[in-house]
Structure formats: C-alpha cells, structure tokens
C-alpha cells in the first residue's frame, strides 16, 4: 500500500510540473503576441498622424517622420506591404 501511495504522489507531482510548464509556455507566447500588437498599434498610430498632418493645407513634407516610421517598421521586422507609405 505504501508503494502505491508513493507512485501516485510521484505521478501527481509530474502532472503538476507538466501543467506549470505548459502554462509558462502559453504565457510566453501571449506576452510576445501582446508586444507585437503594441508595436503594430504604435506604427499604425504614427501613420495615421502622418496622414492627418499631410491633409492639412500648411503641411511641408520634410520626410523626417516618415523615415522614422519606416525605420521603426523595418527594425521590428514588419515586411507587410500594407505598411508602405
């Protein structure tokens, strides 16, 4: 009887460890995705501001902010054509 209890305890401990590892893996994936989404939102917000400024009649394009956005896009690995200005 003692050996069966020990085996059950070891099995339960192993299952708990596996459960914790799976949760940590899922948390890591979630945090990476959240960081990526935040970067995308920042880039889209900058593009929106550029378009609003461009629509103003007294906008003089010095291309500085556009260049900064393009560098930000490429530095974060976005190769999506929708981000092209």
From Swiss-Prot:
<dbReference type="InterPro" id="IPR008187">
    <property type="entry name" value="Vpu"/>
</dbReference>
<dbReference type="Pfam" id="PF00558">
    <property type="entry name" value="Vpu"/>
</dbReference>
<keyword id="KW-0945">Host-virus interaction</keyword>
<keyword id="KW-0899">Viral immunoevasion</keyword>
<keyword id="KW-1133">Transmembrane helix</keyword>
<feature type="transmembrane region" description="Helical">
    <location>
        <begin position="8"/>
        <end position="28"/>
    </location>
</feature>
<keyword id="KW-0014">AIDS</keyword>
<dbReference type="GO" id="GO:0039502">
    <property type="term" value="P:symbiont-mediated suppression of host type I interferon-mediated signaling pathway"/>
</dbReference>
<keyword id="KW-1090">Inhibition of host innate immune response by virus</keyword>
<keyword id="KW-0813">Transport</keyword>
<dbReference type="GO" id="GO:0032801">
    <property type="term" value="P:receptor catabolic process"/>
</dbReference>
<keyword id="KW-1043">Host membrane</keyword>
<keyword id="KW-0812">Transmembrane</keyword>
<comment type="similarity">
    <text>Belongs to the HIV-1 VPU protein family.</text>
</comment>
<dbReference type="GO" id="GO:0042609">
    <property type="term" value="F:CD4 receptor binding"/>
</dbReference>
<keyword id="KW-0406">Ion transport</keyword>
<feature type="topological domain" description="Cytoplasmic">
    <location>
        <begin position="29"/>
        <end position="85"/>
    </location>
</feature>
<protein>
    <recommendedName>
        <fullName>Protein Vpu</fullName>
    </recommendedName>
</protein>
<dbReference type="GO" id="GO:0016020">
    <property type="term" value="C:membrane"/>
</dbReference>
<keyword id="KW-0597">Phosphoprotein</keyword>
<keyword id="KW-0407">Ion channel</keyword>
<dbReference type="GO" id="GO:0033644">
    <property type="term" value="C:host cell membrane"/>
</dbReference>
<keyword id="KW-0053">Apoptosis</keyword>
<dbReference type="GO" id="GO:0005261">
    <property type="term" value="F:monoatomic cation channel activity"/>
</dbReference>
<feature type="topological domain" description="Extracellular">
    <location>
        <begin position="1"/>
        <end position="7"/>
    </location>
</feature>
<keyword id="KW-0472">Membrane</keyword>
<dbReference type="GO" id="GO:0019076">
    <property type="term" value="P:viral release from host cell"/>
</dbReference>
<dbReference type="GO" id="GO:0052170">
    <property type="term" value="P:symbiont-mediated suppression of host innate immune response"/>
</dbReference>
<comment type="subunit">
    <text>Homopentamer. Interacts with host CD4 and BRTC; these interactions induce proteasomal degradation of CD4. Interacts with host BST2; this interaction leads to the degradation of host BST2. Interacts with host FBXW11. Interacts with host AP1M1; this interaction plays a role in the mistrafficking and subsequent degradation of host BST2. Interacts with host RANBP2; this interaction allows Vpu to down-regulate host BLM sumoylation.</text>
</comment>
<comment type="function">
    <text>Enhances virion budding by targeting host CD4 and Tetherin/BST2 to proteasome degradation. Degradation of CD4 prevents any unwanted premature interactions between viral Env and its host receptor CD4 in the endoplasmic reticulum. Degradation of antiretroviral protein Tetherin/BST2 is important for virion budding, as BST2 tethers new viral particles to the host cell membrane. Mechanistically, Vpu bridges either CD4 or BST2 to BTRC, a substrate recognition subunit of the Skp1/Cullin/F-box protein E3 ubiquitin ligase, induces their ubiquitination and subsequent proteasomal degradation.</text>
</comment>
<dbReference type="GO" id="GO:0039587">
    <property type="term" value="P:symbiont-mediated-mediated suppression of host tetherin activity"/>
</dbReference>
<keyword id="KW-1084">Inhibition of host tetherin by virus</keyword>
